[in-house]
Amino acid sequence: MPFLDHDRGRAYYRHWATDEPRAAVVFLHGFGEHTGVYHRYGFALNAAGIDLWAVDQFGHGLSPGDRGDFGSIEDSSALADSLTALAAEAGVPVIAQGHSFGAIVTLFRLLDGDTRAAAAVISGAPLVPVAELLDADTSVQLDPDWLSADPFYLDTLENDPLAFVDADTTALARELDRGWDRFGADLPGLEVPTLAVHGIADPIASIGAVRAYAEQINPLQLQEFPGRHDILNENVHREVAAAIVDFIDAQL
């Protein structure tokens, strides 16, 4: 199996490859997920001539770590750095993408001046505090109905031993809080063309915050879809993937 080396251990990654890619997406998943829940998305990108690279972050999937503990934003960013280096070997534009916590890491990378990303995509981005995580001393249990209404996806989550909806969230809340402290001052300085795709009925990450930022920040576009938090795995997943492909096309 392919792994990325890191001080915390070896992190598993997947590569959905096309024969002649015209772009590559480097993807960071969210809490409780792993790369294996994104096959549909990978195949949709492949059909459009785009490679997808994704890593099981620490505490998730086949990578080491306590359940649900991503470590620091810098830990996840280092994994994205390694994956970006692999994706760039094809000599095609690289698109940075993240979902939920992965979106927070992706935005940190852009604001810190990562020049390798031609553009970025974020989904389910929690840009303001999440009520369930304000008490960092407790664990969280997500209601699967908060995530998606797609019965296929919900069945996958229920029967996937690598996916989960509950874990200690001390580390997660700590790192998200860093984002919430930073974004008010720094996010208006975003310079990289970025598409936010978001479910109108997302009960975890408020779409209102994304709307407000998109109105202020010229490079940040928002496309809204009927659905909940895991919009890439919602009933409208085809439409969401198509919107992302259209956005990438416009950047090439």
Q: What is the meaning of each model-derived region?
A:
Residues 220-252:
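Catalytic active-site module of serine/aspartate enzymes centered on a nucleophile-bearing elbow/loop
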Residues 35-37, 42-66:
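Conserved alpha/beta-hydrolase
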Residues 116-189, 232:
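The alpha/beta-hydrolase serine catalytic core
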Residues 22, 30-33, 200:
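Active-site glycine-rich loops that stabilize anionic/oxyanionic intermediates
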Residues 31-34, 61-90:
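Catalytic nucleophile-loop/oxyanion-hole region of alpha/beta-hydrolase
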